């Protein structure tokens, strides 16, 4: 049984930055550090930070006065940002810069009174944060998930519309929704550059290549990770058995029955240590040396805030 590794896989620059922000805050200021929502959607990462003193909350009211608060990589609404400011909390923003780009698109639309349509999944924190950038009562902000949603959507002015997307969507599904938007609203304006982030696009391309060869595909990622779920769906659409797993412990030996090639990839919020543990487990079940597939090279780095770049020894 040959083990094939998708390339690229695992951490993206935005996730790496968000985790580093929490780690640096803990090093510089000690515990507790409060984080609004899971900083990234991965159980292993969140549990590790929790053990080091991070406290994950959903409501700003749960943060004591004068405490340090970190916004997650998914971003927050302006209402949440304003609430933190009014509470005089020390805030470090771990919002992925590529999510911030979409926030700015929405804010510009709101300022101009242009109605905005967001393609995304209802209830996802990134969507909630992005929708929360729009405040113009004379305009409108709408959420669609499918072409059917587009055809049922009612707007105020079909000639004054723009759209943007959640950063972690299925590329294929999103293009189908965009096609419907352009057909329904011919004058709609899209972003100058695709909102789906480079890491999402690259990992989806990699899992397609992986699915061409693998009989079964394991996607390392947590159930609440949007981009990890999309990877598993892509492999399934390719006709392959695909399993979204948090760790090697989730692997059932029966899933490997009859498999000659086993593919492994990881969502953008899954650390490499989990992938290595999966590889080790597959070897125990008869897998050979893991082979890296060819893929796109990623060298993007997002810096942490300058306030967190100081040496620990400078803090008394």
Swiss-Prot record:
Which class of enzymes does this protein belong to? oxidoreductase
Q: Which family does it belong to?
A: Belongs to the IspH family.
How this chain assembles, per its entry, is: Homodimer.
Q: Where does dimethylallyl diphosphate bind?
A: 41, 74, 124, 225-227, 269
- What are its cofactors? [4Fe-4S] cluster
Q: Name one GO biological process term.
A: terpenoid biosynthetic process
Please name the CDD domains in this protein's record. lytB_ispH
Pathway the protein takes part in: Isoprenoid biosynthesis; dimethylallyl diphosphate biosynthesis; dimethylallyl diphosphate from (2E)-4-hydroxy-3-methylbutenyl diphosphate: step 1/1; Isoprenoid biosynthesis; isopentenyl diphosphate biosynthesis via DXP pathway; isopentenyl diphosphate from 1-deoxy-D-xylulose 5-phosphate: step 6/6
Q: Which UniProt keywords apply?
A: 4Fe-4S, Iron, Iron-sulfur, Isoprene biosynthesis, Metal-binding, Oxidoreductase
What reaction gets catalysed by this protein? isopentenyl diphosphate + 2 oxidized [2Fe-2S]-[ferredoxin] + H2O = (2E)-4-hydroxy-3-methylbut-2-enyl diphosphate + 2 reduced [2Fe-2S]-[ferredoxin] + 2 H(+); dimethylallyl diphosphate + 2 oxidized [2Fe-2S]-[ferredoxin] + H2O = (2E)-4-hydroxy-3-methylbut-2-enyl diphosphate + 2 reduced [2Fe-2S]-[ferredoxin] + 2 H(+)
Per the UniProt entry, what species is this protein from, by scientific name?
Pectobacterium atrosepticum (strain SCRI 1043 / ATCC BAA-672)
Give the active-site positions.
126 (proton donor)
| Name of this protein | 4-hydroxy-3-methylbut-2-enyl diphosphate reductase
A Pfam family this chain is assigned to: LYTB
- A molecular function (GO) term: metal ion binding
């Amino acid at each position: 049984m040959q083990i094939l590794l998708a390339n690229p896989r695992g951490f993206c620059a935005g996730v790496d930055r968000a985790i580093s922000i929490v780690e640096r805050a803990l090093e510089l200021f000690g515990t507790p550090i409060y984080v609004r929502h899971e900083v990234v959607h991965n159980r292993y990462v969140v549990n590790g930070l929790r053990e080091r003193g991070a406290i994950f909350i959903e409501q700003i009211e749960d943060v004591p006065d004068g405490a340090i608060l970190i916004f997650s990589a998914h971003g927050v609404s302006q209402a949440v940002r304003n609430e933190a400011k009014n509470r005089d909390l020390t805030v470090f923003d771990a919002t992925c810069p590529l999510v911030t780009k979409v926030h700015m698109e929405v804010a510009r639309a709101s300022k101009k009174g242009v109605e905005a349509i967001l393609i995304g999944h209802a209830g996802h924190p990134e969507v909630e944060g992005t929708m929360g950038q729009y405040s113009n009562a004379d305009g409108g902000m709408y959420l669609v998930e499918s072409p059917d949603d587009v055809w049922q959507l009612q707007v105020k002015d079909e000639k004054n519309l723009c759209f943007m997307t959640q950063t972690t969507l299925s590329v294929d599904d999103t293009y189908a929704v965009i096609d419907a938007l352009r057909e329904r609203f011919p004058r709609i304006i899209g972003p100058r550059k695709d909102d789906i982030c480079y890491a999402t696009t690259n990992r989806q391309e990699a899992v397609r290549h992986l699915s061409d060869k693998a009989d079964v595909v394991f996607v390392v990622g947590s159930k609440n990770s949007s981009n990890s779920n999309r990877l598993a769906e892509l492999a399934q659409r390719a006709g392959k058995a695909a399993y979204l797993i948090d760790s090697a412990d989730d692997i059932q030996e029966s899933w490997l029955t009859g498999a000659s090639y086993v593919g492994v990839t990881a969502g953008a919020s899954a650390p490499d240590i989990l992938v290595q543990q999966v590889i080790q487990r597959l070897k125990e079940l008869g897998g050979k040396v893991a082979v890296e597939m060819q893929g796109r090279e990623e060298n993007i780095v997002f810096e942490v805030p300058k306030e967190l770049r100081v040496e620990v020894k400078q803090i008394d």
